[in-house]
């Protein structure tokens, strides 16, 4: 059950990326948990070209640069406590990736979002001025991501 809750919590964090990153509503879950060549989310056009590659967590520089080469746009959503250390180590290595945007979800907000994870859930999402409110019918979590690059 703990692994299931972790997976659901990660997908809750993906729920944050969906409303902030799409203007066409065509992002789809990929197979990143079991397919190393795929992101967490992506948007492909009808020619199967990757328009937008979305990573969640702290990918290494090789993965970020690979994504940058394959997609028109790459977004990383980092949510761990160690994000500042990870980003300090990664900044210079990915500086030439001009199509890369990196966001940090503050730790407290990420934990509150993860706490919404249930086996079965419905979430309502509102976005205004870069702030996201996610509600599960009982609890509302406010997320204000911090842009690290892009």
Please annotate each region the language model reported:
Residues 55, 73-78, 101-103:
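Short hydrophobic alpha-helical runs that function as membrane-insertion/retention elements
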């Amino acid at each position: 059950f703990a692994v299931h809750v972790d997976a659901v919590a990660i997908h809750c964090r993906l729920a944050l990326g969906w409303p902030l990153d799409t203007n066409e509503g065509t992002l789809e879950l990929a197979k990143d948990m079991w397919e190393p060549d795929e992101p967490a989310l992506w948007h492909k056009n009808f020619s199967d070209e990757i328009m937008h590659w979305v990573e969640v967590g702290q990918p290494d520089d090789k993965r970020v640069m690979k994504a940058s080469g394959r997609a028109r746009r790459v977004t990383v959503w980092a949510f761990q406590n160690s994000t500042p250390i990870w980003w300090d180590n990664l900044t210079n290595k990915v500086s030439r990736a001009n199509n890369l945007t990196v966001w940090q979800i503050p730790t407290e907000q990420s934990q509150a979002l993860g706490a919404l994870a249930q086996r079965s859930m419905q979430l309502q999402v509102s976005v205004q001025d870069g702030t996201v409110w996610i509600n599960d019918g009982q609890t509302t979590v406010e997320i204000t991501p911090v842009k690290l690059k892009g």
